[in-house]
Amino acid sequence: MAENFSFDVVSDFDRQELVNALDQVKREISQRYDLKGTDTSLDLEKDNIFITTNSELTLNSVIDIIRQKAIKRKLSIKIFDFNSIEVVSGNKVKQTITLKKGLNQEIAKKISKNIRDEIKKINVSINGETLRVMSKSKNDLQLAIKLLENLEETYKIPLQTNNYR
């Protein structure tokens, strides 16, 4: 029985769930007493979320709401990379949140090395923004999945496994 079992490791998120979470945030901003009249705007573009509001205090409140709604929609808050706060025209502040998606080559190599160092009978290959983990034993693959859960905290990126064969 020389059959190989495998799974893929990706760093991804459900964009529709993110859109739904941001819609809930916009609704809450318009309804909350402390945020009414703050002229807060929330815009989602390809890989960025732009928040513009009157003060840093309001900005921090909006960021907290974004985190809460993302968690409720089963999105990892590790997908958010918060850039520095900019002061724009007048008294307004703006923050850009970059959305992390995909494994870059550097992190993929580190994860691959960590898996191979821990579990000797396993093969890991890098395919673009995904890692393919292969082994003849399903038990080794299950150990690799447990190891990936720990590496997720180490590298501060969301990792998912799919295509388990």
Swiss-Prot record:
InterPro entries: DUF520 (IPR007551), UPF0234-like_C (IPR035571), UPF0234_N (IPR035570), YajQ-like_sf (IPR036183)
Pfam name, any one: DUF520
Molecular function per GO: nucleotide binding
Highest rank taxon of the organism: Bacteria
Tagged with keyword tRNA processing: no
Record's GO cellular component terms: cytosol
Keywords tagged on the record: Nucleotide-binding
Record's function text: Nucleotide-binding protein.
Similarity comment text for this entry: Belongs to the YajQ family.
Protein name as annotated: Nucleotide-binding protein PMM0481
